[in-house]
């Protein structure tokens, strides 16, 4: 026979697998899961346990009921009892010796044996003789709980308890004559303990199956169940929670049944609280007043007389009413649950409509409020009217959810439409303005794009001032010209200082800002470098100036940087005053200078033009007053005004990193007033003004328009030429600077082009170009910028300059390590390396070059780049020889006997063989001999023997030409 699994047996018995597993564990059979297999004997025992009706015997003649049996009203007289009932009394008597033997071993085990003998039946003795305790479960099937209302006690519980009391009483009477008889109090306590405490595992295996798995069978009597009281109590509590009305009805019926039974009972005491009660309309088994055994005469008659009979129709009616009420309660619960779901859904819809109503722009209210009576009708008609599709206002970018709210559509519709358009998007994904416009057009909406207000753009846009608040301001004058034409010397003469003597090489390499006073009016001078490397500085000076002074040496005339300065001034649209300097020199010719200026569009006033020309001598201080008068005249004609009562705005002229003071910026205030404590922004740097110094080094607390000052307090060194603006607070400054830095990073990432397959060969070719890596450190930002531009102009197609890093301040150890890693040199301009940097440079063998004059640095870099250039190769012919005789040797090969026609033939030279004007071979000499001696060279007019490497096909009359290749170094132009 095939072994059955637990779940197959459960399906066959129509019960749960878990219940079978629990029952098998109680019987002492270990089962792990529902897939475990069972032996045939175990399956048969479970069949007998859960289907005892299959082993029923045929009914015999009616007999008196045995102890422990329950007699239903409809089965008392008319039906015949099974033959197994006949043996109950005999079995009780036959088991008395066993009980006595067990009682000698222990009182508690005696009580258990008594109860086990009482519950034994004759139904399964023949089938399972090996486990007698299980036989009491096979006696007869139990009645299903479906036949009674939920929560009501069973009708046979009281009878079962009374039968147990009868058995105990019978046992005590049988033991009355023994020495080890137990008091009645101890026996009662033991009965209560057996009813309340949990059974040991052996007795747990004998517990009956659940009552709800089998249909009720009227032909079989119910057997007692010791643990049903607790389960029935739980069912009663559950029934009370489900329906109070049904519970009250059941309680009334239960109490009425108890009263009827108490009146009908003879010789029994009333039911106490805590004991198992009877089912409404059920039976109470009564304990006979007389001590009659089941086999005694008159026992059955007394039993039937004391058992009241309740009509079955009354029980069925009460059961039907209770079941209907339970069904009504379940139906009400389902209705309440569905109503709750509907209310929650309506609430969510109302909240969504309220949110859309708040986002929707409200139309203007027209007319009076007297038309309020017609509002409900208008609202009822609103859904029928088509919605007016107003233009959707969008910003720079929007999410799908925001666009759906504005269009009164669900996000799913928009996502579906985007998928149709080939765009995969989520509900929170941002889409650009173009995509949003196309998507809105698909639904018939127009789009208006309104970009958000850019705070940075508003700050950079200079507002218009009220003409009443404008005041006169000093003019800003920029001195421009060629190098060594005397710009700084002229300013020294005006300021009565000696700045030129303190500058390296006698040339200006920074923008200097000064302020002088003449005739009670202030003039601000900006001194720009004249060297060609400082083009950016000159252009920056021309942008911030009001008047440009073009200094031209009378002996040199117009030079390249002079022309560049003229172009900067014209581009900035500022008036130009020409100062012809060095008129005291012997070779001075001012007229020639004026003639040259006319070639560039500057015509002197005395020649009918509008350009003011002043002859000055900075060395002898001649013509300075005339120059200042002309400056004030042009400024007065220009009507220079500014508003000092507003936040300051200006330009960063120069910036540097001071070791003791940190980032320092020379700024020119162009409008407003700059105060100590103001928060300002300059490019990617921001800060609070901690201190200000004027051009003479004095601390000041405020600086008005056209005032050059030195500002301390920046977070980092700003770029020269940046516009600085005073803002309200530091928080706003940080926000704007963060945006600028993020924008700068994005631009750098965009500028980094990706290498494609088509450009791969191009990049390979570029890899063959030699590079000279340079790290620039200078004292001011302007010098770094000038050096960078000057060195980058030296790059050619074969060698180029790679500026790895440029910064302001002293040379540090970090710069040295960067140069070592990138194989670069360090150029320091007006700065020195610290101690650690010098030691690191020696250890890493990094070349550090220090300069104070910019053109010295440019010349050295040019020489270094020239050394990287590939040299040019040139061929030099040494001599020619004619082959007149051929000598053949087995070891060497053919030897040419030659006569040197011109020049000389050297042994290490390269040769080529020419036959009839055609080169037939080019190679090296293997040997050169004169007679039998090896020689280094043979000059013109002598004979020699020549052997060629790897070439023997020589002929008489061939010409051997000797030559060498020379390498010629190249220079950068």
UniProtKB/Swiss-Prot annotation:
Region (G1): 481-488
Positions of region (G2): 506-510
Residues where GTP binds: 481-488, 527-531, 581-584
Keywords, comma-separated and alphabetical: Cytoplasm, GTP-binding, Initiation factor, Nucleotide-binding, Protein biosynthesis
Pfam families hit by this protein: EF-G_D2, GTP_EFTU, IF-2, IF2_N
Region (G5): 617-619
Region spans: Disordered: 52-388
Compartments it resides in: Cytoplasm
Gene Ontology molecular functions: GTP binding; GTPase activity; translation initiation factor activity
Low complexity biased stretches: 374-386
Ranges in a coiled coil: none
Composition-biased stretches (Basic and acidic residues): 83-120, 128-148, 157-172, 186-202, 210-246, 272-288, 314-333, 343-360
Single GO cellular component term: cytosol
Region annotation G4: where it falls in the sequence: 581-584
Region (G3) location: 527-530
Its biological purpose: One of the essential components for the initiation of protein synthesis. Protects formylmethionyl-tRNA from spontaneous hydrolysis and promotes its binding to the 30S ribosomal subunits. Also involved in the hydrolysis of GTP during the formation of the 70S ribosomal complex.
Family (UniProt): Belongs to the TRAFAC class translation factor GTPase superfamily. Classic translation factor GTPase family. IF-2 subfamily.
Protein name (Swiss-Prot/TrEMBL): Translation initiation factor IF-2
């Amino acid at each position: 026979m095939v072994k059955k699994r637990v779940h197959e047996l459960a399906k066959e018995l129509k019960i749960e697998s878990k219940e079978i597993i629990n029952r098998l564990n109680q019987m002492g059979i270990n089962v792990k899961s529902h897939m475990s297999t069972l032996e045939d004997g175990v399956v048969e025992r479970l069949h007998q346990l859960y289907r005892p009706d299959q082993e029923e015997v045929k009914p015999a003649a009616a007999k008196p009921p045995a102890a422990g049996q329950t007699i239903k009203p409809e089965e008392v007289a008319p039906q015949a009892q099974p033959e197994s009932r006949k043996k109950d009394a005999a079995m009780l008597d036959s088991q008395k010796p066993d009980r006595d033997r067990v009682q000698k071993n222990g009182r508690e085990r005696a009580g258990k044996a008594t109860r086990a003998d009482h519950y034994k039946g004759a139904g399964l003795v023949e089938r399972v003789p090996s486990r007698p305790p299980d036989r009491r479960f096979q006696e007869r099937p139990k009645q299903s709980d479906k036949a009674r209302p939920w929560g009501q006690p069973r009708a046979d519980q009281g009878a079962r308890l009374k039968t147990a009391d009868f058995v105990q009483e019978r046992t005590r009477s049988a033991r009355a004559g023994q020495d080890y008889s137990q008091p009645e109090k101890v026996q009662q306590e033991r009965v209560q303990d057996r009813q309340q405490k949990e059974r040991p595992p052996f007795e747990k295996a004998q517990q009956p199956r659940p009552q709800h798995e089998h249909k009720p069978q009227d032909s079989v009597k119910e057997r007692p169940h010791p643990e049903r009281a607790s389960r029935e109590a739980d069912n009663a509590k559950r029934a009370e929670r489900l329906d109070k009305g049904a519970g009250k009805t059941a309680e009334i019926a239960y109490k009425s049944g108890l009263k009827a039974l108490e009146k009908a009972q003879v010789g029994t005491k009333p039911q106490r609280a805590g004991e198992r009660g009877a089912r409404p309309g059920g039976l109470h088994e009564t304990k006979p007043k007389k001590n009659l055994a089941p086999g005694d005469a008159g026992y059955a008659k007394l039993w039937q007389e004391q058992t009241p009979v309740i009509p079955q129709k009354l029980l069925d009616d009460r059961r039907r009413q209770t079941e209907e009420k339970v069904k009504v309660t379940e139906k009400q619960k389902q209705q309440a649950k569905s109503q709750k779901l509907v209310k929650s859904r309506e609430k969510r819809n109302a909240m969504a409509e309220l949110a859309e109503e708040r986002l929707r722009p409200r139309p203007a209210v027209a007319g009076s409020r007297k038309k309020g009576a017609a509002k409900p009708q208008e609202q009822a008609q609103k859904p029928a009217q088509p919605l007016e599709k107003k233009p959707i206002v969008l910003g720079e970018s929007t999410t799908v959810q925001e666009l759906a709210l504005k269009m009164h559509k669900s996000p799913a519709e928009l996502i579906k439409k985007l998928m149709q358009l080939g765009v995969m998007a989520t509900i929170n994904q941002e889409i650009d303005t173009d995509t949003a416009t196309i998507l809105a057009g698909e639904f018939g909406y127009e789009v208006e794009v309104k970009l958000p207000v850019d705070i940075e753009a508003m700050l950079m846009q200079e507002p218009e001032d009220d003409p009443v608040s404008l005041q006169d301001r000093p003019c800003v004058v920029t001195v421009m010209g060629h190098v060594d034409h005397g710009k700084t010397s002229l300013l020294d003469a005006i300021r009565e200082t000696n700045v030129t003597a303190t500058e390296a090489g006698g040339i200006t390499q920074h923008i200097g800002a000064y302020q002088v006073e003449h005739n009670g009016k202030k003039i601000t001078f900006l001194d720009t470098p004249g060297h060609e490397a400082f083009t950016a500085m000159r252009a920056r000076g021309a942008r911030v100036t009001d008047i440009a002074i073009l200094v031209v040496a009378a002996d040199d005339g117009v030079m390249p940087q002079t022309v560049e300065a003229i172009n900067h001034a014209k581009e900035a649209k500022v008036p130009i005053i020409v100062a012809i300097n060095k008129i005291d020199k012997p070779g001075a010719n001012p007229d020639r200078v004026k003639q040259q200026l006319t070639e560039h569009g500057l015509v002197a006033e005395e020649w009918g033009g509008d350009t003011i020309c002043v002859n000055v001598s900075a060395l002898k201080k001649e013509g300075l007053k005339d120059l200042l008068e002309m400056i004030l005249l042009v400024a007065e004609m220009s009507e220079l005004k500014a508003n000092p009562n507003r936040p300051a705005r200006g330009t960063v002229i120069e910036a540097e990193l001071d070791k003791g003071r940190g980032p320092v910026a020379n700024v020119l205030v162009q409008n407003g007033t700059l105060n100590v404590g103001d928060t300002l922004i300059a490019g990617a740097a921001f800060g609070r003004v901690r201190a200000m110094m004027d051009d003479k080094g004095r601390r000041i607390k405020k600086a008005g328009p056209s005032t050059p000052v030195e500002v301390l307090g920046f977070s980092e060194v700003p770029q020269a030429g940046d516009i600085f603006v005073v803002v309200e607070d530091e928080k706003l400054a940080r926000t704007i600077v963060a945006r600028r830095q993020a924008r700068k990073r994005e631009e750098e990432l965009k500028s980094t082009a990706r290498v494609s397959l088509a450009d791969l060969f191009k990049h390979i070719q570029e890899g063959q170009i030699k590079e000279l890596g340079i790290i620039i450190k200078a004292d001011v930002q302007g010098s770094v910028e000038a050096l960078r531009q000057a060195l980058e102009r030296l790059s050619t197609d074969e060698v180029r300059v790679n500026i790895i890093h440029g910064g302001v301040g002293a040379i540090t150890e970090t710069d040295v390590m960067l140069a070592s890693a990138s194989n670069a040199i360090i150029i320091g301009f007006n700065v020195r390396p610290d101690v650690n940097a010098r030691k690191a440079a020696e250890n890493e063998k990094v070349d550090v070059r220090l300069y104070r004059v910019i053109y010295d640095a440019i010349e050295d870099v040019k020489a270094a780049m020239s050394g990287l250039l590939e040299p040019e190769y040139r061929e030099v012919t040494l001599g020619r020889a004619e082959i007149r005789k051929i000598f053949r040797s087995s070891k060497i090969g053919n030897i040419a006997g030659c006569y040197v026609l011109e020049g000389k033939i050297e042994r290490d030279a390269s040769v080529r063989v020419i036959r009839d004007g055609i080169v037939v071979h080019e190679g090296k000499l293997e040997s050169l001999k004169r007679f039998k001696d090896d020689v280094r060279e043979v000059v013109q007019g002598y004979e020699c023997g020549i052997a060629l490497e790897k070439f023997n096909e020589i002929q008489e009359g061939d010409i051997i030409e000797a030559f060498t290749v020379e390498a010629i170094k190249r220079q950068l132009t």
